[in-house]
């Protein structure tokens, strides 16, 4: 009996990734431990991104960060899904997760994929008001800038705007990016 035929995506949604306090991990660690044993279980976890429950999607994102940090080589088989589908989900936790994954696993992205990831992160900077999305996107730009030193300059307008943001975490990081240009 395969995991797919048993509908583990539904099990994750119903039993493991729902309920509890919205900011808690719930049973995310348990899901990670289950998936890490058998790579094909990722397919069931990916299905959780289609849940209408934003807490399920938040915990799914958290699970993927943990899985890919433990098994970074697994990202190779799923990067296209994150670049082409997951990154388009209009939820802050999903967006900051994509920014983090693209930054942390940039060495697994081919040149064309790096450009796409950079565009996604730039779009997040220009369209999000969530401070975590903004900070993780700027952190990703720092990483991309090490590969292509035009990255920060290409986003200078939004970075200058963010350097005046009322939220200290956002403005401080934007100022750091501006200082990288001057070096």
Where are these regions (language model features)?
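Single conserved hydrophobic/aromatic residue that forms the stacking wall/gate
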Residues: 1-12
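Alpha-helical scaffold domains
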Residues: 10-183
């Amino acid at each position: 009996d395969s995991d797919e035929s048993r509908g583990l995506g539904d099990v994750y949604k119903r039993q493991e990734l729902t309920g509890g306090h919205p900011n808690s991990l719930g049973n995310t660690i348990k899901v990670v431990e289950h998936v890490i044993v058998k790579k094909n279980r990722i397919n069931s976890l990916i299905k959780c991104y289609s849940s209408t429950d934003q807490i399920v999607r938040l915990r799914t994102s958290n699970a993927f960060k943990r899985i890919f940090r433990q098994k970074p080589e697994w990202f190779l088989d799923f990067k296209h899904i994150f670049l082409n589908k997951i990154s388009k989900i209009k939820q802050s936790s999903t967006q900051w997760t994509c920014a983090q994954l693209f930054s942390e696993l940039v060495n697994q992205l081919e040149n064309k994929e790096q450009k796409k990831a950079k565009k996604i992160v730039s779009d997040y900077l220009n369209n999000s008001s969530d401070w975590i999305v903004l900070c993780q996107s700027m952190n990703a730009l720092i990483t991309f800038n090490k590969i292509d030193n035009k990255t920060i300059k290409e986003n200078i307008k939004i970075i200058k705007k963010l350097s005046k943001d009322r939220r200290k975490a956002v403005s401080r990081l934007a100022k750091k990016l501006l200082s990288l240009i001057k070096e």
